[in-house]
Amino acid sequence: MIVLDASAAVELMLTTPAGAAVARRLRGETVHAPAHFDVEVIGAIRQAVVRQLISDHEGLVVVVNFLSLPVRRWPLKPFTQRAYQLRSTHTVADGAYVALAEGLGVPLITCDGRLAQSHGHNAEIELVA
């Protein structure tokens, strides 16, 4: 069981080399994420289209494929207080991933080096590159 953040999901969905490493790490795992995960990932896919890294059609396909990932989305409300407590070292969005990982007692998988180096929490954070 793991928590997957948006940076790792985007790499996975865009089939980058880091995404291949994420796919290997996810094998056999039950994947969890906070509810805002979808908005973050779809926003990043949109940015890939805007930057012409992928076509509009490819973006639509990636979104459809993303929405079919077997990820358990958790409501934000139970984790918002902890996410706010992490405000001095994390964005609220990142804090929600950390809070969920802490709450479930499972690793947080990320491709975000800054998040992987963060402190002030009890989560195990794995940087996948």
UniProtKB/Swiss-Prot annotation:
Its EC number is 3.1.-.-. SUPFAM superfamilies: PIN domain-like (SSF88723). It comes from the Bacteria. Gene3D superfamilies: 5'-nuclease (3.40.50.1010). Mg(2+) binds at residues 5, 94. Its cofactor is Mg(2+). Disulfide bonds: none annotated. Keywords: Hydrolase, Magnesium, Metal-binding, Nuclease, Toxin-antitoxin system. The keyword Ubl conjugation does not apply. The keyword Hydrolase applies. One of its GO terms (molecular function) is magnesium ion binding. Pfam families: PIN (PF01850). Toxic component of a type II toxin-antitoxin (TA) system. An RNase. The cognate antitoxin is VapB12. Belongs to the PINc/VapC protein family. This is Ribonuclease VapC12. It comes from Mycobacterium tuberculosis (strain CDC 1551 / Oshkosh).
